[in-house]
Amino acid sequence: MTRLAIPPDIRFGVGGFPLAFTERPEAKDRGAVFAWLRSVGLDAIELQMTYGPRMTAEQGRRYRALAIADDIKLSIHGSYYIVLASPDPAKVLRSVDTLLRTYEQADILGAREIVLHPGSLYGAPEADVSRRFAENLERFMAQLGKTDISLMIETAGKVGQMGSVDMILDVAATIKGVGPCIDFGHVHARSLGGLE
């Protein structure tokens, strides 16, 4: 079998803690995931912060040390409750707070990317909602200031959600510190099986 030479900056990993790990006895200590990933030939993990950044600083520092020891790249998937496109200013403020805390968590972990879904269309045209999202995101990034942590906006898998490839690329091209995260499974679902 011919092995491909993979450039050193390309990593392969998992999102969250896979069943193949969590069903093992050593999974009682979630920190064992880093050695397990290395043992199965993977070198990256996206930590899921579905309900927000709840990890203690001590646990974050421990995960960072374990990830470095096993050469595992860490990234974070931000909470689905971060809704910068919401028409409700109170929800946007809560979202800004959660996203700021996610950046703090990423810094402790040594993660250099935070992945974020742009959210619902709220029954409005994508152009209108994506404009509100981009304006709120631009204000957030200005408030955040200089950072080496990139915010990666991910494509959505449902047509009723904001997150087309074009929208993601437009936002990433216009806001400093923001990049695209193209999830091909989501693109395939969004296009109703359109990827060949």
Task: Label every model-predicted segment.
Residues 18, 23-27, 127, 162-166, ...:
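Gly/Pro-rich active-site loop or hairpin
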Residues 2-10, 174-184, 188-196:
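Histidine-acidic metal/acid-base catalytic patches
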Residues 1-101:
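N-terminal pre-domain/capping segments
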Residues 18-20, 49-53, 78-82, 118-122, ...:
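Active-site-proximal loop/turn and secondary-structure-junction residues that shape catalytic pockets
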Residues 44-48, 76-79, 104-108, 145-146, ...:
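Short C-terminal domain-edge/linker segments immediately following a structured domain
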Residues 68, 85-180, 189:
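Active-site acidic/histidine proton-transfer and metal-coordination neighborhood
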